[in-house]
Amino acid sequence: MINNLDIKPDIKLSVKQTFGIDSDLEIEAFSKKNEYVPEIDKNYIFDKDTTLAILSGFSFNKRVLVQGYHGTGKSTHIEQVAARQNWPCIRINLDSHVSRIDLIGKDAISIKDGKQITEFKEGILPWSIQNPVALVFDEYDAGRPDVMFVIQRVLEADGSFTLLDKNKVIKQNKYFRLFATSNTIGLGDTTGLYHGTQQINQGQMDRWNIAVSYTHLTLPTKRIV
Protein backbone atom coordinates (compact mmCIF):
# COMPACT_ATOMS: atom_id res chain seq x y z
CA MET A 1 0.00 0.00 0.00
CA ILE A 2 2.28 2.70 -1.28
CA ASN A 3 0.40 4.63 -3.92
CA ASN A 4 -2.73 6.62 -3.20
CA LEU A 5 -5.92 5.77 -5.07
CA ASP A 6 -6.87 8.56 -7.46
CA ILE A 7 -10.52 7.57 -7.82
CA LYS A 8 -13.94 8.76 -6.73
CA PRO A 9 -17.54 7.52 -7.09
CA ASP A 10 -18.79 8.13 -10.62
CA ILE A 11 -22.06 6.19 -10.92
CA LYS A 12 -25.36 5.74 -9.06
CA LEU A 13 -26.93 2.43 -8.03
CA SER A 14 -30.52 1.60 -7.13
CA VAL A 15 -30.80 0.21 -3.60
CA LYS A 16 -33.82 -1.84 -4.65
CA GLN A 17 -32.12 -3.46 -7.63
CA THR A 18 -28.73 -3.90 -5.97
CA PHE A 19 -29.72 -5.17 -2.52
CA GLY A 20 -33.30 -6.35 -2.97
CA ILE A 21 -34.60 -3.84 -0.43
CA ASP A 22 -37.87 -2.00 -1.02
CA SER A 23 -36.47 1.52 -1.25
CA ASP A 24 -36.30 4.25 -3.86
CA LEU A 25 -32.86 5.39 -2.68
CA GLU A 26 -29.87 5.66 -4.98
CA ILE A 27 -26.30 5.40 -3.75
CA GLU A 28 -22.92 6.46 -5.07
CA ALA A 29 -20.60 3.78 -6.40
CA PHE A 30 -17.42 3.27 -8.40
CA SER A 31 -17.70 2.04 -11.98
CA LYS A 32 -14.38 0.18 -11.85
CA LYS A 33 -13.07 -2.42 -9.45
CA ASN A 34 -9.56 -2.47 -7.99
CA GLU A 35 -7.51 -4.87 -5.88
CA TYR A 36 -8.98 -3.62 -2.59
CA VAL A 37 -12.61 -4.30 -3.53
CA PRO A 38 -14.02 -7.52 -1.97
CA GLU A 39 -15.34 -10.28 -4.19
CA ILE A 40 -19.11 -10.38 -4.65
CA ASP A 41 -20.99 -13.34 -3.16
CA LYS A 42 -23.96 -13.59 -5.52
CA ASN A 43 -25.87 -15.78 -3.06
CA TYR A 44 -25.57 -13.36 -0.16
CA ILE A 45 -28.88 -12.27 1.40
CA PHE A 46 -28.93 -8.81 2.95
CA ASP A 47 -30.61 -7.96 6.25
CA LYS A 48 -32.68 -4.82 5.63
CA ASP A 49 -31.94 -2.81 8.79
CA THR A 50 -28.24 -3.65 8.83
CA THR A 51 -27.87 -2.89 5.13
CA LEU A 52 -29.59 0.50 5.43
CA ALA A 53 -27.35 1.38 8.39
CA ILE A 54 -24.22 0.47 6.42
CA LEU A 55 -25.45 2.35 3.36
CA SER A 56 -25.98 5.42 5.55
CA GLY A 57 -22.32 5.15 6.45
CA PHE A 58 -21.27 5.08 2.81
CA SER A 59 -23.73 7.69 1.55
CA PHE A 60 -23.59 10.25 4.36
CA ASN A 61 -20.14 9.60 5.85
CA LYS A 62 -21.51 8.26 9.13
CA ARG A 63 -19.49 6.11 11.51
CA VAL A 64 -21.30 2.77 11.80
CA LEU A 65 -20.82 0.11 14.49
CA VAL A 66 -22.34 -3.33 13.82
CA GLN A 67 -22.83 -5.40 16.98
CA GLY A 68 -23.85 -9.04 17.16
CA TYR A 69 -23.01 -12.57 18.20
CA HIS A 70 -20.06 -14.40 16.69
CA GLY A 71 -20.69 -16.10 13.37
CA THR A 72 -23.58 -13.91 12.25
CA GLY A 73 -21.54 -12.35 9.44
CA LYS A 74 -21.16 -8.78 10.64
CA SER A 75 -17.93 -8.08 8.77
CA THR A 76 -19.08 -9.99 5.71
CA HIS A 77 -22.20 -7.84 5.60
CA ILE A 78 -20.08 -4.68 5.36
CA GLU A 79 -17.81 -6.28 2.77
CA GLN A 80 -20.70 -7.37 0.56
CA VAL A 81 -22.23 -3.89 0.62
CA ALA A 82 -18.83 -2.44 -0.33
CA ALA A 83 -18.34 -5.08 -3.03
CA ARG A 84 -21.50 -4.07 -4.84
CA GLN A 85 -20.39 -0.44 -4.85
CA ASN A 86 -16.84 -1.34 -5.94
CA TRP A 87 -15.76 0.56 -2.82
CA PRO A 88 -12.23 -0.36 -1.67
CA CYS A 89 -12.53 -2.06 1.72
CA ILE A 90 -9.84 -3.02 4.22
CA ARG A 91 -10.39 -5.03 7.40
CA ILE A 92 -8.19 -4.88 10.50
CA ASN A 93 -8.66 -7.36 13.33
CA LEU A 94 -8.06 -5.55 16.62
CA ASP A 95 -6.61 -8.49 18.53
CA SER A 96 -4.27 -7.96 21.45
CA HIS A 97 -1.23 -7.99 19.15
CA VAL A 98 -2.26 -4.92 17.13
CA SER A 99 -0.40 -1.93 18.55
CA ARG A 100 -0.43 1.82 18.11
CA ILE A 101 2.71 1.51 15.98
CA ASP A 102 0.99 -0.96 13.64
CA LEU A 103 -1.76 1.55 12.95
CA ILE A 104 0.21 4.79 12.77
CA GLY A 105 3.58 3.66 11.43
CA LYS A 106 7.19 3.46 12.56
CA ASP A 107 10.77 4.28 11.64
CA ALA A 108 12.26 1.82 9.19
CA ILE A 109 15.61 1.37 7.48
CA SER A 110 15.59 1.90 3.71
CA ILE A 111 18.03 2.52 0.87
CA LYS A 112 17.97 5.91 -0.86
CA ASP A 113 20.53 7.07 -3.42
CA GLY A 114 22.64 4.06 -2.52
CA LYS A 115 22.73 5.00 1.15
CA GLN A 116 21.08 3.38 4.13
CA ILE A 117 18.77 5.79 5.91
CA THR A 118 16.10 5.69 8.59
CA GLU A 119 12.74 7.16 7.65
CA PHE A 120 9.20 7.04 8.94
CA LYS A 121 6.89 4.58 7.18
CA GLU A 122 3.21 5.39 7.52
CA GLY A 123 0.93 2.63 8.78
CA ILE A 124 -2.42 1.44 7.49
CA LEU A 125 -4.42 4.15 9.26
CA PRO A 126 -2.78 7.24 7.68
CA TRP A 127 -2.90 5.55 4.27
CA SER A 128 -6.58 4.70 4.62
CA ILE A 129 -7.54 8.18 5.79
CA GLN A 130 -5.99 9.71 2.68
CA ASN A 131 -7.81 7.39 0.28
CA PRO A 132 -11.38 6.51 -0.79
CA VAL A 133 -11.37 3.43 1.41
CA ALA A 134 -13.86 1.80 3.78
CA LEU A 135 -11.81 0.83 6.84
CA VAL A 136 -13.38 -1.87 9.02
CA PHE A 137 -12.17 -2.61 12.55
CA ASP A 138 -13.11 -6.18 13.45
CA GLU A 139 -13.37 -7.21 17.12
CA TYR A 140 -13.52 -3.53 18.00
CA ASP A 141 -14.29 -4.24 21.66
CA ALA A 142 -11.10 -6.32 22.02
CA GLY A 143 -8.74 -3.46 21.11
CA ARG A 144 -6.01 -2.29 23.47
CA PRO A 145 -6.58 1.06 25.24
CA ASP A 146 -3.68 2.81 23.47
CA VAL A 147 -5.04 1.64 20.11
CA MET A 148 -8.56 2.79 20.94
CA PHE A 149 -7.42 6.32 21.63
CA VAL A 150 -5.71 6.43 18.23
CA ILE A 151 -8.98 5.39 16.60
CA GLN A 152 -10.89 8.01 18.56
CA ARG A 153 -8.98 10.70 16.68
CA VAL A 154 -10.52 9.67 13.36
CA LEU A 155 -14.06 8.99 14.50
CA GLU A 156 -15.07 12.55 13.77
CA ALA A 157 -16.16 12.96 10.16
CA ASP A 158 -13.82 15.34 8.35
CA GLY A 159 -11.57 15.41 11.41
CA SER A 160 -7.84 15.84 10.84
CA PHE A 161 -5.26 13.29 11.96
CA THR A 162 -1.91 14.54 13.25
CA LEU A 163 1.21 12.46 12.64
CA LEU A 164 3.51 13.71 15.36
CA ASP A 165 6.39 11.61 14.04
CA LYS A 166 6.36 13.60 10.78
CA ASN A 167 4.95 16.92 12.01
CA LYS A 168 2.18 16.35 9.50
CA VAL A 169 -1.56 16.98 9.61
CA ILE A 170 -3.58 14.60 7.45
CA LYS A 171 -6.99 15.59 6.16
CA GLN A 172 -9.51 12.86 5.53
CA ASN A 173 -10.29 11.93 1.95
CA LYS A 174 -13.83 12.92 1.03
CA TYR A 175 -14.67 9.26 0.44
CA PHE A 176 -12.93 7.70 3.45
CA ARG A 177 -15.41 5.66 5.50
CA LEU A 178 -15.08 4.02 8.91
CA PHE A 179 -16.91 0.96 10.25
CA ALA A 180 -16.44 -1.47 13.14
CA THR A 181 -17.86 -4.77 14.34
CA SER A 182 -18.12 -5.99 17.93
CA ASN A 183 -19.65 -8.76 20.00
CA THR A 184 -20.62 -6.39 22.81
CA ILE A 185 -21.91 -2.85 22.71
CA GLY A 186 -19.07 -1.28 24.69
CA LEU A 187 -20.07 -2.44 28.17
CA GLY A 188 -17.71 -5.38 28.34
CA ASP A 189 -18.59 -9.09 28.50
CA THR A 190 -21.67 -9.54 30.69
CA THR A 191 -22.44 -13.06 29.43
CA GLY A 192 -19.13 -14.90 29.82
CA LEU A 193 -19.11 -15.66 26.10
CA TYR A 194 -16.50 -13.15 25.01
CA HIS A 195 -13.50 -13.25 27.29
CA GLY A 196 -10.96 -10.59 26.34
CA THR A 197 -13.42 -7.90 25.34
CA GLN A 198 -13.10 -4.52 27.03
CA GLN A 199 -15.36 -1.82 28.32
CA ILE A 200 -15.09 1.06 25.86
CA ASN A 201 -14.72 4.69 26.86
CA GLN A 202 -18.21 6.22 26.71
CA GLY A 203 -16.82 9.33 25.06
CA GLN A 204 -15.61 7.15 22.21
CA MET A 205 -18.86 5.20 21.94
CA ASP A 206 -20.76 8.46 21.59
CA ARG A 207 -18.72 9.29 18.50
CA TRP A 208 -20.28 6.44 16.55
CA ASN A 209 -23.17 7.94 14.61
CA ILE A 210 -25.02 4.66 14.10
CA ALA A 211 -25.00 1.42 16.10
CA VAL A 212 -26.98 -1.47 14.67
CA SER A 213 -27.56 -4.88 16.24
CA TYR A 214 -27.23 -7.85 13.92
CA THR A 215 -27.69 -10.86 16.17
CA HIS A 216 -29.52 -13.46 14.12
CA LEU A 217 -29.81 -14.93 10.65
CA THR A 218 -32.80 -13.87 8.61
CA LEU A 219 -35.48 -16.44 7.80
CA PRO A 220 -34.49 -16.78 4.10
CA THR A 221 -30.89 -17.39 5.17
CA LYS A 222 -31.94 -20.11 7.60
CA ARG A 223 -33.79 -21.88 4.82
CA ILE A 224 -30.71 -21.89 2.61
CA VAL A 225 -28.52 -23.21 5.43
Predicted regions, residues:
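AAA+ P-loop NTPase catalytic core and its hallmark functional loops
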Residues: 2-217
